[in-house]
């Protein structure tokens, strides 16, 4: 693999993985994200209850899980498709790596004082990865080839 191909296809994958890792630190813990989600919601709806703020924050955080792993899986699929002629194999490898990274990410969070690791979050991450793969595959023009075929 030449440097140009690596930079074009694999550097975005690695950069996104670093972004996810940094997000797993205290930097994006619930305590820190509540500092901007709560005030925004109170500005938007001054009479909002604390319970509603907490619920919205939870939904936003879980949507972030879905989105970050959808992007990771799509980037992996894009990179694998450059060297892997079989769509199904690229799809499976992308999902597997995203799922393993999700599990490792939650394991990492279990060692961060302000975070907790959760198997439910791994499930949400895997659902996001699957959604990202399906969306990318559909939008990229690969939809003409069925999963398992060569093109």
Show where each model-derived region lies.
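"…centered on the first transmembrane helix and the immediately adjacent amphipathic helix/loop
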Residues: 1-74
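Membrane-helix interface segments
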Residues: 5-9, 83-95, 115-119
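Small-polar-interrupted transmembrane alpha-helices in polytopic inner-membrane proteins
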Residues: 15-20, 90-110
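Membrane-interface elements of multi-pass transporters and channels
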Residues: 29, 79-83, 87, 111-115, ...
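Catalytic tyrosine of NAD(P)H-dependent dehydrogenase/reductases that use a Tyr as the general acid/base
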Residues: 57-61, 101, 117
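Interfacial helix-loop-helix junctions of multi-pass membrane proteins
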Residues: 102-126
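Short, basic, low-complexity termini and linkers enriched in Ser/Thr/Gly/Pro
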Residues: 142-151
């Amino acid at each position: 693999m030449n440097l140009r191909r690596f930079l074009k296809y694999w550097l975005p994958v690695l950069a996104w993985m670093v972004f996810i890792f940094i997000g797993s630190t205290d930097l994006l813990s619930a305590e820190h994200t509540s500092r901007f989600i709560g005030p925004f919601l109170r500005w938007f709806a001054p009479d909002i209850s604390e319970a509603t703020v907490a619920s919205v924050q939870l939904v936003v955080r879980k949507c972030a899980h879905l989105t970050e792993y959808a992007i990771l899986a799509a980037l992996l699929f894009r990179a694998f498709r450059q060297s892997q002629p079989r769509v199904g194999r690229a799809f499976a490898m992308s999902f597997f790596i995203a799922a393993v990274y999700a599990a490792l990410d939650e394991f990492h969070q279990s060692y961060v004082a302000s975070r907790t690791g959760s198997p439910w979050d791994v499930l949400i991450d895997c659902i996001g990865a699957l959604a990202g793969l399906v969306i990318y595959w559909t939008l990229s023009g690969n939809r003409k080839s069925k999963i398992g075929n060569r093109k």
